[in-house]
């Protein structure tokens, strides 16, 4: 029998055996309450800290302890210092709540003055949320507007307000982004990489167009016209030595590829001036749900163009802020279904990386959404596969929902998972049970559940539950309702 320090016997936790001993077969757990440190500070030694992050957007509760968990890439980087890069990757099979998690984070950040930008919303998952936050929704697709990839957008308007090196840097950045976009669209459409000479020809032609046309007026039609005319800055790169036939042979492939972009659905989307410019005066969603899932090439092209325009507008806004001409702003950008663009053609990993590589000083948090890492390692070349995995490796942290068991080996190459963590996330991928009485499926075991992983640190298993207005604005199955 144990004894108290004073020598008094301490009864067993179930009481003494025998008559009058108070023996019980069940000992109930003590009741628990949660409150702030200020409220519970006088209850020592009965209070215990939860140990979960309390900085950022409240996303749910720790599955093990019930403690509140706060998480978002902006606050975890900016205020908590938990991650080295303000970005996150969300992984999980369809139907587990990836879009709802991103929507919860976007809504919370919007309340803190961080503008959510969704440049390429396929279903759309976030249009209702954007409207509820007072933002704007731009529609693109077949018969729903055009996006001119040669339009410098906000960059030229911002450059006119700048001087010196700041002006030159922004103009050079705008030229580089347009060059990347045209090269990416050509590579995507021809399903072959753009050569270094072709890229130099595009850059020279863009410079000629900038000198001849007001910002936003030149389109891919005029770009083909410059290649056809062959002005000296362009002709010089072909080493034609005054031979017109040699020049025609040198530009024929590129001219044909850009000309192909002007035909059919591609032409409807990219051959004219921009219908609705992206104005970053608040939350923004670009709804491209009008493009059918069967038109994968057009879908990937429009997504890529939207990303390019959005990142260009962000760069212009930050350049004005750095010069003291506008207030400093923070953005949260969501790249959903990223794999659709990466697998659309060889070399597009580099193009996407060039468009999205914003450093920590530019005030941009980012969420990249995949189904599984197999989306990245199923690309055509080993070089592309290696570079694509870098998107997950460089992310500040991962939010892992239910994934198949076959995914664990790939995940282990990116982040350290313990045995119990691996078992947990694979159990979330199990199919739902069947309610024989109601004749319907029960909720899937992994819905709303995520494991937050930062490098080799122990993961935080979180259960997210939608509340109040979220139930309506984050409903991704609207078309199935009667």
Model-flagged regions — what are they?
Residues 71, 80, 87-93, 104-206:
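Switch/coupling segment of Walker-type NTPase motor domains
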Residues 75-77, 81-96, 103-106, 292-428, ...:
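Conserved P-loop NTPase motor cores
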Residues 1-89, 481-482:
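Basic- and hydrophobic-enriched, low-structure N-terminal and domain-boundary segments
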Residues 44-64, 131-133, 155-364, 440-444, ...:
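P-loop NTPase motor domains
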Residues 137-139, 283-285, 398-400:
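Conserved beta-strand scaffold positions in the cores of enzyme catalytic domains, especially
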Residues 29-30, 41-43, 49, 96, ...:
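Loop-rich catalytic cores of soluble enzymes, especially ATP-dependent carboxylate-amine ligases
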Residues 78, 97, 124-128, 145-147, ...:
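Flexible loop/turn segments at secondary-structure boundaries
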Residues 165-218, 380-482:
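P-loop NTPase motor core of the ASCE superfamily
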């Amino acid at each position: 029998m144990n004894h108290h320090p004073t020598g008094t016997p301490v009864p067993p936790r179930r009481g003494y055996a025998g008559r009058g001993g108070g023996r019980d077969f069940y000992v109930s757990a003590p009741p628990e309450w949660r409150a702030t440190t200020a409220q519970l500070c006088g209850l020592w030694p009965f209070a215990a800290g939860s140990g979960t992050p309390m900085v950022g957007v409240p996303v749910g509760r720790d599955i093990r302890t019930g403690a509140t968990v706060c998480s978002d890439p902006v606050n975890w980087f900016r205020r908590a210092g938990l991650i080295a890069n303000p970005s996150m990757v969300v992984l999980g099979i369809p139907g587990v709540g990836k879009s709802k998690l991103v929507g919860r984070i976007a809504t919370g950040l919007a309340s803190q003055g961080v503008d959510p930008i969704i440049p390429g919303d396929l279903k759309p998952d976030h249009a209702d949320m954007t409207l509820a936050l007072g933002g704007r929704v731009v529609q693109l697709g077949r018969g729903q507007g055009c996006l001119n990839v040669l339009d410098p957008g906000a960059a030229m308007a911002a450059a006119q307000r700048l001087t010196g090196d700041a002006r030159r840097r922004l103009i050079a950045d705008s030229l580089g982004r347009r060059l990347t976009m045209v090269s990416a669209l050509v590579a995507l459409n021809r399903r072959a990489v753009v050569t270094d000479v072709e890229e130099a020809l595009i850059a020279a032609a863009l410079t000629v167009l900038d000198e001849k046309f007001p910002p936003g007026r030149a389109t891919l039609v005029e770009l083909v016209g410059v290649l056809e005319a062959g002005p000296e800055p362009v002709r010089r790169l072909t080493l034609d030595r005054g031979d017109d036939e040699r020049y025609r042979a040198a530009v024929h492939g590129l001219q044909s590829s850009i000309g192909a972009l002007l035909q059919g659905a591609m032409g409807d989307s990219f051959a004219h001036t921009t219908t609705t410019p992206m104005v970053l005066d608040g939350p923004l969603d670009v709804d491209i749900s009008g493009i059918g899932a069967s038109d994968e090439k057009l879908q990937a092209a429009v997504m890529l163009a939207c990303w390019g325009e959005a990142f260009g507008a962000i760069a212009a806004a930050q350049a004005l802020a750095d010069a003291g001409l506008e207030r400093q702003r923070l953005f949260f950008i969501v790249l959903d279904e990223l794999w659709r663009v990466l697998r659309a053609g060889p070399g597009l990993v580099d193009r996407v990386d060039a468009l999205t590589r914003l450093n920590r000083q530019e005030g941009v948090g980012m969420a990249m959404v995949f189904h599984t890492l197999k989306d990245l390692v199923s690309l055509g070349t080993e070089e592309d596969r290696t570079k694509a995995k870098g998107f997950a490796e460089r992310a500040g942290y991962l939010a892992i929902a239910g994934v198949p068991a076959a995914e664990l080996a790939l995940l282990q190459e990116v982040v350290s998972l313990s045995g119990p963590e691996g078992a947990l996330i694979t159990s979330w991928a199990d199919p739902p049970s069947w309610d024989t009485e109601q004749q319907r499926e029960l909720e899937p075991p992994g819905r709303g559940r995520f494991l937050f992983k930062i490098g080799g640190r122990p993961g935080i298993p979180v259960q997210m539950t939608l509340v109040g207005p979220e139930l309506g604005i984050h409903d991704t199955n609207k078309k199935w309702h009667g």
